[in-house]
Amino acid sequence: MSWDSRPAKETGWFNSDEALYLQLRNQIILGIATDKIRDGDPLPSVRQLADHIGINMHTVNKAYTVLRQEGFVKVDRRRGAVISLDSDKYAALDELHKELGVVLAKAHCKNITRSEVHDLIDEIYDDYFCPSRYGEPKSED
């Protein structure tokens, strides 16, 4: 993967109240979902990425640790962090169930209807799998 050479402040990264390590984690997951990062691709070293985007090395390390725990990255002492997608679908579905439970509870508290949630999910799903945007759709096996 080639990282944007501009500083993080110029790319729009890290413009929210969410913890920086979670924002970095989310950007990497989005990169995987959109095929900008692929299984087997190395990630920059902790030091390189921290220097490049202008954040603390511990923040990058924490993001990589979370990605490893979630089955997106393997860390090898010689190769560094490498994208390695864990194919345990049942564990992924269980994790998704937990995360969506909180999201749906928030939506319910804000009077967002089931139909509106479904429309939003369809819209987001199409952002990742729409042929006109990213070429051929990913396999949905």
Language model features: what each stretch is:
Residues S45, R79-L85:
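Minor-groove-contacting beta-hairpin "wing" of winged helix-turn-helix DNA-binding domains
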Residues Q23-L24, T59, E99:
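Charged catalytic carboxylate motif
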Residues S87-D88, E99, K138-D141:
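C-terminal alpha-helical interaction appendages
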Residues P42-K74:
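N-terminal helix-turn-helix
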Residues M1-P42, Q48, D94-E95, L104-D141:
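Extreme N-terminal segment that seeds HTH/winged-HTH DNA-binding domains in transcriptional regulators
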Residues A8, R25, D51-H52, R68, ...:
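Contiguous, function-dense segments enriched for cysteine-driven chemistry
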Residues S84-D94:
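A surface-exposed regulatory interaction patch that couples sensing to output
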